[in-house]
Each structure stands twice: as C-alpha cells, then as structure tokens.
Amino acid sequence: MTKLLMINAHPHTTVPSASLTVAASFKTAYQQTHPHDEITTRDLYQDGVPALNDTTFEAWRKRKYGEELTSVEAELLSRHASWLAEFLAADKIVFVNPMYNHFLPAELKQYLDLTAVARKTFKYTVNGPVGLLPDKHVLHIQAAGGYYHQPDQHNQVEAGDPYLRGMMQLYGIQDYRTIFIEGLDQFPEQREQAITAAQVAAEKLAGEF
C-alpha cells in the first residue's frame, strides 16, 4: 500500500491558514483519486518534535558506549526512532508551512534535523554524501505575505524552500514539487483569489502525485 505522509508545520491560530486550507484541498482530492492509499498527518506543533538537545546528545553518547539510559533518555530516543521510521516508511511526503522571516518555521527545521541521519536517509562516501531515498516524492506547500517566486520579486531572500529542496536532494529525492500561495498580506484584497488559485493547482496535482 502506498503511504502519503503530510507534515503540517503551522501553529494553531484563530486566523484561517492559507497553507492548511490548500493542503486540505490537496488531501481531499488525493483521497478521491487514490482511495486505497494510506494517509498519515503529522502535526509538528500539536505533537511536538522530539528534541535535539543536551539530553539527546548525552543519550547518544551513553548508547554508543553501552551505558544505561535514564527513562527520560530512553523515551526521547524512542520518539526519535519512531518519527524517523514514519518518515522512511512514506512513499510520498507533503510539507505544509508558512514562511517565517524568509525561512521555515523552527519546528520544521527541527524535524529536518531529526530526519537527517547518516546511513538512514543518506550515507557518506569517498565522493561525498549519497542519498538513500531516491524513490520518494515530495510536495512543498508554502504561504507567504509577500511575493518571492515571481519574476523580479526578491527571490534571493526566500531561503526556506531552497533549504528544504536541498535537504531532500541530500536524501536522494529528485521528484520535488511546489505550490506557493503568496502576496496574502501585500495585497489583502487578492487573498481569496490567491488561495483559490492554489487550491485548484493542488487539486490538479493530487491526481498525478
């Protein structure tokens, strides 16, 4: 069974989210065109990304030298392993997020740190790193208040999508697609039009993804 993993990296607010709205349209259309696929949604804000902190590094050190872990350390490493296994098991992955200060939300960056594991998602060779996940497919849905992916619209200050694309390339993933919902704050009168256009694009892409 084909597995689709949706990574929601958007805080829960009372203001409707453009990226989550478009992602919902994609999911509905995908379910209709892929009725037998398994869809899992991972909410980074609600679930809490397993930490990469002092406790993590101490637990790794203890495990390396065969020392006994505390219950907190064991639970943390168990969550790391579980989340990584979920990522590895997915055939298709959809990242959904707003753009924060020309980059990704911190929770999504932390998730990428969690999945960047040598000998799992990539390996080191004498010729440099080689990705281990060439058969996966990725879609990135991102919303922004301004324009960053139009001709002459400050493309150089948008670092989030290029970073995500680069990480997927590190993992060996070449099929990487994007849907950008932009200009939402710069031209608020065109907000609904921009969201609707992105929903149409998402529904179309869902059928072939």
Swiss-Prot record:
Domain of life: Bacteria
Enzyme Commission code(s) on record: 1.6.5.-, 1.7.1.17
Transmembrane segments: none
Keywords for this protein: Flavoprotein, FMN, NAD, Oxidoreductase
GO molecular function, one term: oxidoreductase activity, acting on NAD(P)H as acceptor
Required cofactor names: FMN
Catalytic activity line of the entry: 2 a quinone + NADH + H(+) = 2 a 1,4-benzosemiquinone + NAD(+); N,N-dimethyl-1,4-phenylenediamine + anthranilate + 2 NAD(+) = 2-(4-dimethylaminophenyl)diazenylbenzoate + 2 NADH + 2 H(+)
Quaternary context: Homodimer.
Protein name stated in the entry: FMN-dependent NADH:quinone oxidoreductase 2
Gene source species: Lactiplantibacillus plantarum (strain ATCC BAA-793 / NCIMB 8826 / WCFS1) (Lactobacillus plantarum)
Lineage: Bacteria, Bacillati, Bacillota, Bacilli, Lactobacillales
